[in-house]
Amino acid sequence: MSSTDTTTEAPRDERRDAEMARITDALGAAVLDSLVKANDDMWIRVSADAWRTTGETLKSLGYSYFCFLSGIDWLPSPFGKGEEDPTEPTPERDSTIKQGYTGGATRFQVIARVMQPFTSLGVNIKVDIDDSMAIDSWCSVYAGANWHERETHEMFGIGFNGHPDLRNMYLPSDFEGFPLRKDFPLLARIVKPWPGIVDVEPLPGDDEQEGEAS
């Protein structure tokens, strides 16, 4: 390396680094992966069997403010972005699942965020959802998780063990499918063939006139 070469060090965030160390020490083996984005945010991924105790531990560490909980479907959409020309053959799409920050091993995950109200520090918690498509409820830990879990169950089909009432909030009880899954077909995703194609429908009587002309 010459004297003119410089190395760029990754930015450090001592405050969040110290807080992440405190969190991972408290959670122990439950933490599968963690990430601190300097001057931005913190992420952890925990084992499914420690999901509820993770919430309890974080609350005891001062993360008493529940922000949100939802599901993630990492499957690349088989419909693409709905921007292709419908008259052209369907292009080949990459079906590789990439789970984002702190990784993962499953198509579906649950993500939640909690904060310390007096320090502005927050942490995002992810957990893999296996084929049982269920995880323990956080309702007994954070009351605000109630309707977030209901919505996640309704839109992704992820169950929450111990939840007092997982009835649908938006959809009819007999609705089939889960609208926020990537493989759920939404007609609104399909680009209408305009202005490249003009779809002309025959007017009433056109068929008769064509028959007379022949």
PLM regions: where:
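Terminal low-complexity/charged segments
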Residues: 1-214
